[in-house]
């Protein structure tokens, strides 16, 4: 496969275990994934994580429980290399989600999401852990 660009798009992701389920999002009908997105040039990683979670699921108050864990892979659809920086988060059990209009939220049993996330095996395994 010929890569279009040697530059990596760096994204920050949040693995959220909410009441024993893993929270995944689906944007614009695409595939299920951890919430998060690209880090803007002017942002710190923490700022980007807070912005992305506010934009996607309407949550800005959280506690980091572990991280970061890094993943490097190829986005086959866009034919570009990606780097994800993933953090595990904890939310209050009474948290209410307010997703943006193009985002669907799903809560999945960790043992049953193996066919839901279609990135690299290492990344998929991390989500299921």
What are these regions (language model features)?
Residues 1-13, 19:
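Acidic, metal-coordinating catalytic segment for phosphate/diphosphate chemistry
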Residues 16-19, 89-91:
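Active-site beta-strand termini and strand-to-loop segments that position acidic
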Residues 26-29:
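C-terminal lobe/hinge of AMP-binding adenylation domains
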Residues 33-37:
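A short gly/proline-enriched turn/hairpin at secondary-structure junctions
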Residues 39-63, 71-122:
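Unchanged
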Residues 66:
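Short loop/edge segments at beta-strand edges and connector loops
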């Amino acid at each position: 496969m010929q890569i279009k660009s040697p530059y990596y798009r760096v994204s920050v992701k949040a693995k959220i275990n909410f009441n024993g389920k893993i929270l995944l999002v689906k944007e614009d009908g695409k595939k299920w994934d951890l919430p998060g997105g690209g880090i803007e040039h002017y942002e710190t990683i923490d700022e980007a994580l807070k912005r992305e979670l506010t934009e996607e699921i309407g949550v800005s108050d959280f506690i980091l429980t572990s991280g970061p864990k890094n993943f490097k892979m190829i986005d086959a659809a866009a034919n570009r290399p990606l780097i994800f920086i993933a953090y595990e988060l904890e939310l209050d059990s009474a948290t209410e989600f307010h997703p943006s209009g193009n985002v669907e939220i799903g809560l999945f049993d960790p043992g049953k999401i193996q066919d839901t996330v279609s990135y690299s095996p290492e990344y998929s395994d991390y989500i299921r852990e």
